[in-house]
Amino acid sequence: MTYLGRRDKRLAEIIRTIGPVERESWPDLFTALVSSIVSQQLSGKAADTIWRRVQERCGGEVTPRSLLAQDEAALRGCGLSARKVSYVRTIAREVASGALDLAELATLPDDAVCERLTALPGIGRWTAEMVLIFSLQRPDVVSFGDLAIHRGLRMVYRHRTIDRQRFERYRRRYAPYGSLASLYLWAVAGGACGLNDPAERTPKSRRP
């Protein structure tokens, strides 16, 4: 936090206002991948309900073996779409067969992890970057594809839009602690500081 505060005065103010931030970690990489697919395009409440059903169906622990023991109908009965069932079963088979070595991912650089994960069905760049932060505990990840990160940047730095060039400038400024900066940007986007989003300003009407 001290380093980020020295690098960026506005972020320093945010850090002082919010104080320490903590986020839930996903220590099991397979569980993180499957739960990420389960939650895609769902509200938090719906995703939690379906995930709980999947866990119960798998005997309380979602592993490649317990997941593959369930047929498609059983997983559909938990609330998963046919496409999501196909995704999670494919990933389970990849891990169970050894084609995907999850332990090896911890030894790879960030870009290589993203490349490996995005080759899996249902895993995009954003999901891979969240895995980097919350499962592999990588210290320097700021996701351009995260809408809340964009919102937090707009709110902190008073921009109407965040293009790639502007995003990269901030990302470089936060390095090598981009993941910590991400936590604060998410907190800001969630209303922790009471800032408004410049992108949501109502344009002033012109006089006739």
Segments the model singles out, each with a brief description of its role:
Residues 1-21, 110-111, 125-208:
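C-terminal accessory module of base-excision DNA glycosylases/AP lyases that mediates lesion recognition
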Residues 10, 14, 42-121, 173:
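Alpha-helical ds-nucleic-acid-binding substructure associated with the helix-hairpin-helix region
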Residues 25, 45-49, 62, 66, ...:
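Alpha-helix N-cap and coil->helix boundary residues
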Residues 30-34, 47, 68-71, 109-113, ...:
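N-terminal alpha-helical segment
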Residues 33-37, 75, 171:
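Amphipathic alpha-helical segments that form the core helices of the histone-fold
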Residues 34, 88-91, 153:
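Buried hydrophobic packing segments
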Residues 36, 52, 115, 151, ...:
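Active-site phosphate/pyrophosphate- and oxyanion-stabilizing loops and adjacent acidic/basic residues
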